[in-house]
Amino acid sequence: MTIILKPGSVPLETLEKIYREGLPVRIDPAFHAGIEKAAARIAEIAAGDAPVYGINTGFGKLASIRIAAGDVATLQRNLILSHCCGVGEPLSENIVRLIMALKLVSLGRGASGVRLEVITLIEAMLEKGVIPMIPEKGSVGASGDLAPLAHMTAAMIGEGEAFYRGERLSGAKALGKAGLKPVVLAAKEGLALINGTQTSTALALAGLFRAHRAARTALITGALSTDAAMGSDAPFHEEIHQLRGHKGQIDAGRALRTLLEGSAIRRSHLEGDQRVQDPYCIRCQPQVDGACLDILRQAARTLEIEANAVTDNPLVLSDGRAVSGGNFHAEPVAFAADQIALAVCEIGAISQRRIALLVDPSLSFGLPAFLARKPGLNSGLMIAEVTSAALMSENKQMAHPASVDSTPTSANQEDHVSMACHGARRLLQMTANLNAIIGIEALTGALGVELRKPLTTSAELAKVIAALRAKVATLEEDRYMADDLKAAAELVADGTLSGVISAGILPDLEA
C-alpha cells in the first residue's frame, strides 16, 4: 500500500501510519505542475544576472559572495558534503522514513523550486527501502536541520551512507543495489533539501505519538490502581469536571469513570468506608492527566501545521519572486517538544506515586507490603517501585525546556536558534522511561486487584489484566523481575494494553 500525500493537508493520522508502519509514500500527481513551475522559475533566476541567495551566492555568512553560472552544480554538491557534520548513532529507520516523507510534503507545495526528478528519487528510495544514514546529533534547529538533512541528501547524490535490506552501505552502493541512480543537483536544490525543520518535526511527531499512546494507557493503569487501592470513583463524576471546563480533564474523568464501571471491588466499599478522601494521585487523576492531554493536543496542532509547512529558504512566491525569509527557524517545534516533555514527565510522576501507594501497607488499605504474598521472605514489587522512581527522576531532569537555550552560530549570522532537534530527540528516551513506569504500574495495579479476590474489577479492566497475564504471569513468589518489567513496558509501547479497551472510552489526540 502506498500513501498518496496532498501537501498542505496531510493529517496526523497519516503521519502516524508512516511512522509506525513504514509505508511508502508519493506526492499526489495533481501537485506536479506547481512543482515544475517553481523549478522553471529557479532555472530562470540562475541564468540571470541578479544575485539571489542560495541560487547564485554562497551560504550563511558567505551569502555576499557571487557564484559563477558554471559553478552552480558544484556549489550545491559542496554544500551537501560540507554540511554532513552529524555525530552520534544513526537515527532509526522509522524516524528517517518520516523525515523523508515530511521533506516530500514540503517540496510538494511548489515553493521550493526543486525539479520533479528530485521528488521522484525520494519516493523511489522510500519504496525500495534505501534509507539514508543520518547521525542523531548536530542540529540547532535553525537554519533548519542542516547537518541531518545533509546526510539524507548525501545518499541521494551517491555520497554518504545508507541502509539497504539490513546492510549499511555507501550511498552510491545502496542506490545501485536498489536499481536507482544518484541525482545531480541543480540550482538551489541542495539548499532546498537541507534547509528545513523536517528532522526536528519528525522526532517531535514520534515523541507525540509515543506520548499519546502512553497517556491513554496511563488512564487504564490509573483506573487499575484506583480499584486495587479500593479508591473512590466519586471524584470522576462528570459534573465536577464540567464545572471546571477543561476538555482534557472532562475526557480523562469520563474515561476513568467508564473504565471502573461495574467493579465489584468498588461496590464493596460504597457504604461504611471510613476514608473521606483518597490521596491526590488517585483523586486528582482527571486534573493531572487531563491537563497533560490538553497540552499534547496543543502540541499536535502545532506539529500538524509544521508537517505541512514549507520551511526552506529562499521561497518561490506566487508572483515568481524568490524571497529570503526565516521559515527554517524551528521555534514552534521546539515549543511543542517542550510541551510534550512536560506532559510525559507529569504522567510518569503521578503514575509513580500510585505505584508507591500500592506497595505501602500504610496506604494501600489492606494489601500486603510490596504486594508480596509472604512479606519478608519475599520482597515482591519493592525494587520495581524503586526503578519507577529512578525513571521518574530521570524524566524530570530531561523535561527542562530546550527552547530557552539559544546560542549564536555561523559567525553571528544565525544568532538565535531553537534547539528543537535535541529537544525533540530526548522525547524518545523520555517516552521509553514513561512506558516502563506505566508498565510497572500495570504490574502493580493488576496484582493489587488480584489480591482483592474474590472481589473482581470491571469488565474493561479485566480485559487489561488478561492481556497482561498473557505475557507476564501473576507474581506468586520472588523471581527474576527484569523480564517482567521489559514485557510490561512493551505492552504499553506497542498498544496492546490500550488496544483491548472498547472503542470510544480512551481519549483521542485530535479533539
From Swiss-Prot:
<feature type="cross-link" description="5-imidazolinone (Ala-Gly)">
    <location>
        <begin position="142"/>
        <end position="144"/>
    </location>
</feature>
<dbReference type="GO" id="GO:0019557">
    <property type="term" value="P:L-histidine catabolic process to glutamate and formate"/>
</dbReference>
<comment type="similarity">
    <text>Belongs to the PAL/histidase family.</text>
</comment>
<dbReference type="InterPro" id="IPR024083">
    <property type="entry name" value="Fumarase/histidase_N"/>
</dbReference>
<dbReference type="GO" id="GO:0019556">
    <property type="term" value="P:L-histidine catabolic process to glutamate and formamide"/>
</dbReference>
<keyword id="KW-0369">Histidine metabolism</keyword>
<dbReference type="GO" id="GO:0004397">
    <property type="term" value="F:histidine ammonia-lyase activity"/>
</dbReference>
<dbReference type="Pfam" id="PF00221">
    <property type="entry name" value="Lyase_aromatic"/>
</dbReference>
<dbReference type="InterPro" id="IPR001106">
    <property type="entry name" value="Aromatic_Lyase"/>
</dbReference>
<protein>
    <recommendedName>
        <fullName>Histidine ammonia-lyase</fullName>
        <ecNumber>4.3.1.3</ecNumber>
    </recommendedName>
</protein>
<dbReference type="InterPro" id="IPR008948">
    <property type="entry name" value="L-Aspartase-like"/>
</dbReference>
<dbReference type="InterPro" id="IPR005921">
    <property type="entry name" value="HutH"/>
</dbReference>
<feature type="modified residue" description="2,3-didehydroalanine (Ser)">
    <location>
        <position position="143"/>
    </location>
</feature>
<dbReference type="InterPro" id="IPR022313">
    <property type="entry name" value="Phe/His_NH3-lyase_AS"/>
</dbReference>
<dbReference type="GO" id="GO:0005737">
    <property type="term" value="C:cytoplasm"/>
</dbReference>
<keyword id="KW-0456">Lyase</keyword>
<keyword id="KW-0963">Cytoplasm</keyword>
<comment type="pathway">
    <text>Amino-acid degradation; L-histidine degradation into L-glutamate; N-formimidoyl-L-glutamate from L-histidine: step 1/3.</text>
</comment>
